[in-house]
């Protein structure tokens, strides 16, 4: 069978490589959905870049909003009729906390933060618009990372920060994790 999956597709590079190798070995088609390539404005941007209508691209900047913080809460009973073990999947079992389920992106074992959640959409757009689908960045760097205070919060992933990358063709990419939901996302 072929596979369609939502992000995050893996939580480690090793998991990602295992996925690719397994699909190749089985002859399985794998697709991770990011739902942005069918958006008219992104299609227009790609056409403009690939046809050279905006000149030489040297940097692509994008932004995801800051992650929430989840205050410590006590475990509670699992809601009736809900299979918490299935929701957890292969991650280490933890007592049920509704806020943890609602804010799954704020924990390493279920979401890995906003860069892995929403940043996936914008990284895909950079790859697609630049025509680098079958390659990827050759250098990575993170900076300005702000972590939640573990005394106040149970959330684990970065609240804000900056992800920079460089492609083999010399184009730079930057994804900022800052601002709110309605801020500009790609320029």
Stretch-by-stretch model annotation:
Residues 85-171:
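Rossmann-like dinucleotide-binding domain that binds NAD(P)(H)
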Residues 21-28, 43-58, 75-81:
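Basic phosphate/pyrophosphate-binding loop/patch that engages nucleotide-derived ligands
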Residues 1-38, 52:
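Beta-strand-loop-alpha-helix segment that lines the small-molecule cofactor/substrate pocket
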Residues 170-185:
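Flexible, glycine/threonine-enriched loop-and-boundary segments that flank and lead into catalytic domains
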Residues 61-100:
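Core domains of carbohydrate- and sulfate-ester-processing enzymes
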Residues 23-25, 39, 82, 156-160:
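Short, solvent-exposed loop/turn segments at the edges of secondary structure
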